[in-house]
């Protein structure tokens, strides 16, 4: 009997037209892939001792990574040097508190991070080829500002189609992902047992939940939710979907449509992924004014507060920015220099102010205390100095890669 489109989404079965991928393990062994992965890994970490050591012995370290991957294969497969195979180390989590939430962060060893970057280099074109266009959060050039621009377009150009919105997120998303289910989903399109074995090995010890802090985790999490994006946009016919990792916003013309969609979303998450929506999901009319009455509510999403004709910054971000500005002003009055992390944080906050309708707030709460132009000059000077210091090292890395290519 032929299965319906909805049944295919509820069960982990391949959909028509989806490409299958083989020989990914062989790609991991390519010299240029290993070197490119290391180049990405070392960004922003050049002062770490492990990175400096690898820089000084790059060719040897590349060969070690090659040997490690070559000898990491499933049980029963002959390898030349089994003692060189990748063996996951015991990980001790670091507890952090972020936005009022307690999170466990796992910090892998440097060679393990390198392996993760190699895996992502191979996986990235596979995942991005079929990823939903407005899925944000971990894809390059698809951050909060990318998502914000699209929401503003929808609100401005389609008032009828954005009368109502549903906002929801998945309960304990990272901690609730089951490794067996994740590996089954990967196996739908990836027909390379050796490649899948290495991914499974990286996540060994996490039968339920994938670790925050692993570079591969965010990519695998996005891959897992691709079928959910297709269910909402294609099967349920709701194209105005914005997903920021596990935070989901859907616009529609009526609440009934959104309520029915939530039923299907919960069904799919439960049956296919063994995941649950949080119970505090919202289905609301979008904010509008009728005479002197204010009806509905604004959308609070990705750090922004969206109205029909304006976008503001979330209150806690604005308060953090103003407190930092005053703190830097006190340092200046005491004839103390600025910390680099404070300068970079302040310039980062300026990104929120420049892309939202908060100029009055900037004028009254930020501008009297700091000079943004001077901060930019300080950071520019620091980066120029770092570039000069790292120029010889960069030549060495490029030269080593070129020599390997010639060989």
Predicted features and spans:
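Residues immediately flanking
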Residues: 121, 168-170, 253, 304, ...
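Non-catalytic, polymerase-adjacent accessory regions of viral genome-replication enzymes
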Residues: 1-67, 386-407
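Right-hand nucleic-acid polymerase module
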Residues: 1-9, 108, 113, 117, ...
């Amino acid at each position: 009997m032929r299965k319906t489109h909805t049944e295919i989404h509820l069960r982990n079965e391949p959909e028509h037209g989806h490409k299958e991928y083989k020989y990914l393990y062989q790609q991991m062994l390519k010299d240029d892939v290993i070197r490119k992965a290391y180049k990405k890994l070392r960004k922003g970490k050049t002062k770490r001792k492990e990175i400096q050591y690898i820089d000084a012995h790059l060719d040897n370290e590349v060969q070690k990574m090659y040997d490690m991957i070559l000898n990491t294969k499933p049980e029963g497969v002959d390898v030349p040097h089994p003692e060189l195979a990748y063996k996951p180390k015991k990980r001790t989590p670091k507890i952090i508190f972020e936005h009022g939430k307690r999170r466990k962060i796992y910090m892998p060893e440097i060679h393990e991070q390198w392996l993760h970057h190699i895996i992502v280099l191979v996986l990235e074109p596979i995942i991005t080829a079929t990823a939903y266009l407005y899925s944000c959060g971990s894809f390059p050039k698809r951050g909060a500002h990318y998502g914000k621009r699209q929401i503003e377009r929808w609100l401005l150009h389609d008032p009828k189609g954005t009368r109502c919105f549903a906002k929801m997120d998945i309960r304990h998303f990272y901690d609730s992902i089951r490794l067996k289910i994740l590996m089954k989903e990967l196996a739908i399109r990836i027909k390379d047992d050796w490649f899948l074995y290495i991914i499974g090995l990286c996540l060994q010890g996490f039968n339920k939940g994938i670790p925050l802090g692993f570079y591969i985790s965010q990519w695998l999490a996005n891959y897992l939710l691709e079928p959910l994006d297709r269910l909402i946009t294609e099967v349920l016919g709701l194209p105005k979907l914005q997903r920021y990792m596990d935070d989901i916003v859907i616009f529609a013309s009526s609440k009934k449509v959104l309520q029915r969609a939530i039923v299907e979303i919960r069904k799919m998450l439960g049956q296919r992924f063994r995941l649950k929506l949080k119970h505090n999901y919202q289905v609301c009319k979008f904010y509008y004014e009728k005479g002197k009455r204010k009806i509905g509510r604004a959308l609070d999403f990705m750090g922004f507060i969206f109205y029909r004709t304006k976008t503001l910054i979330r209150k806690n971000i604005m308060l953090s920015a103003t407190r930092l500005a005053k703190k830097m002003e006190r340092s200046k009055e005491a004839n103390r220099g600025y910390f680099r992390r404070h300068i970079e944080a302040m310039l980062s906050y300026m990104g929120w102010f420049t892309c939202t309708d908060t100029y009055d707030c900037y004028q009254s709460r930020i501008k009297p205390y700091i000079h943004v132009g001077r901060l930019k000059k300080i950071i520019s000077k620091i980066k120029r100095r770092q570039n000069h210091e790292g120029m010889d090292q960069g030549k060495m890395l490029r030269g080593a890669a070129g020599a390997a290519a010639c060989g």
